[in-house]
Curated annotation (Swiss-Prot):
SUPFAM superfamilies: PRTase-like
Pfam families in the cross-refs: Pribosyltran
Protein name per its UniProtKB record: Adenine phosphoribosyltransferase
Gene name tied to this protein: apt
Principal subcellular localisation of the protein: cytoplasm
Location within or outside the cell: Cytoplasm
């Protein structure tokens, strides 16, 4: 597809704090043709790579938008990884370090089956810390991670390196 993705993402300097160059994806979401094209391109990547998973999984929050739409397009399920105390059934969790602290994600244990083929999805790949933690959590429950897909990859932060041997796909590299 010949979509000029970068024109649909706005750089916001010094947000949410000084020194951070925030990538605002909401203009892409607000553009019907752009959003549809992004989902179609993600689906085509899965189809071309023969990488149709059993389900998609995604950490909250903005990635949910892409993962849910892509799961619908592919006709498969979507498993959310949530912040603590958001899921009502028995959960497995993982604590992981961030640049300035620690965070935790949870998933319903019974939703993950041994050998389940999962494609991870998120809006942005930055340092890779959150996605690495998600992948470790799901693998600890017996899932097979077949890859990770992102709308935007911030290549200078080298997040791809943190994801090990997983196939990494991104529509935009910046």
């Amino acid at each position: 597809m010949n979509m000029d993705w970068k024109n649909l993402i706005i750089n916001i300097p010094d947000y949410p704090k000084a020194g951070i160059n925030f990538k605002d994806i909401t203009p892409l979401l607000a553009n019907g043709a752009g959003f549809k094209a992004a989902i179609e391109e993600m689906a085509m990547i899965c189809e071309r790579q023969n990488a149709i998973p059993d389900v998609l999984a995604c950490p909250e929050a903005r990635g949910f938008i892409f993962a849910a739409a892509l799961a619908h397009r592919l006709g498969i399920g979507f498993i959310p990884l949530r912040k603590p105390h958001k899921l009502p059934r028995e959960v497995a969790h993982i604590n992981y370090g961030l640049e300035y602290g620690e965070d935790c994600l949870e998933v319903h244990k019974q939703d993950i089956k041994k050998g389940m083929r999962i494609m991870m999805v998120d809006d942005v790949l930055a340092t890779g810390g959150t996605m690495h933690a998600c992948m470790n959590l799901l693998q600890s429950l017996g899932a097979e991670i077949i890859g990770a897909m992102f709308l935007l990859e911030l290549t200078a932060l080298k997040g791809r390196e943190k994801l090990g041997t997983a196939a990494v796909y991104s529509l935009i590299q910046d």
